[in-house]
């Protein structure tokens, strides 16, 4: 059963080939057997999962037919889950049990999905390798000596290892798309405001967006259907009708205009990845797409702008973790200042402390205009570049990452080298655009992804192109040895 996709599970549950309780029991056993090799879960919620599975079976027996009813899911451990530890991968929240469900968790539970657990992640979603977690690094199922990407590395590794068919993730600078690329999955970052952020512990509030990780575009469409929609509890949520994402999966690509930004193919891109991108372009051309070169002239400024804006927002968001109200508190503080200082110094890991310091510096009186305001101006230029490009093309295509997955620890001592791995993904977050990564081949036995970007609220178009591509290629069907 572990080889089934979400769509196949939906069909199996509908025709009573197996029950949700049987499926849940089998997957929980598989997680306990195999996860110690990859460390993709922080919490496994056996009792909750079996109770939800029995409830889903009862709902189906009573005549309900929802497509996600009884299907399994695991949530990245920054989505609040009522009564279950929500750690954000940090010592700071090691003992925190959320008193409510995040909107995404609530919506999927309402649809009848069964929560198997909470997945490992970079601490407070800050990282591109899933090495900064308080609970230890996650390993890539394709090669256990390599990283799975981050910050949704646990969510990606769990699906890649066939521990379950799909997971939720979040994407602030590529944290769904980059691990999807490095573990041979399909990962979708929706338009900013498409999926509610309520109950999603914030890293950078103007960039964060929740989305699905699965093996196929078809599965991502099913999951996005359950996650998307307006939420009055999230002030950044947008009132935009949610289309039927599955209905447009098979639409023709005839005449679809795809742009290849020349800036994507310069120095820094592994030439073997460039070749795989070109191979995917040829497949899409065979399906009727028209490909042309375009320019995104301000892309070179994206990383410096992002690494001012995101840490600035993080320094503000993470100020709430002070040892007073909830989370980690140091032993026997001398006074209030000592409580703040030691609780935060002991509770936050090195990368989180680094980004808080950078953000606080960028927001300080003497540097605010020079750094933060300038970064926001660059952000506007990047958005304008995309708007101009989408006057000429329907979609933008390129590599998801400049390199395949690197070895564990290889970039730990050089944070900037890790930051540069986000070069192709962060522009979509700065502009708020939807983006998808899909499997496109292998380099040295490690997966490679191709990224598609679309205009606002065109997730259906991204899923359509990825689905048609997956009908004529088999990269997405390949599984790592031993799993």
Curated annotation (Swiss-Prot):
The active site is at residues 76, 151, 175. Gene3D superfamilies: Amidase signature (AS) domain. Its EC number is 6.3.5.7. The keyword Disulfide bond does not apply. The keyword Ribosomal protein does not apply. Keywords: ATP-binding, Ligase, Nucleotide-binding, Protein biosynthesis. GO terms for cellular component: glutamyl-tRNA(Gln) amidotransferase complex. GO terms for biological process: translation. One of its GO terms (molecular function) is ATP binding. It catalyses: L-glutamyl-tRNA(Gln) + L-glutamine + ATP + H2O = L-glutaminyl-tRNA(Gln) + L-glutamate + ADP + phosphate + H(+). Heterotrimer of A, B and C subunits. HAMAP family: GatA. Belongs to the amidase family. GatA subfamily. Allows the formation of correctly charged Gln-tRNA(Gln) through the transamidation of misacylated Glu-tRNA(Gln) in organisms which lack glutaminyl-tRNA synthetase. The reaction takes place in the presence of glutamine and ATP through an activated gamma-phospho-Glu-tRNA(Gln). This is Glutamyl-tRNA(Gln) amidotransferase subunit A. It comes from Pseudomonas putida (strain ATCC 700007 / DSM 6899 / JCM 31910 / BCRC 17059 / LMG 24140 / F1). The lineage of its organism: Bacteria, Pseudomonadati, Pseudomonadota, Gammaproteobacteria, Pseudomonadales.
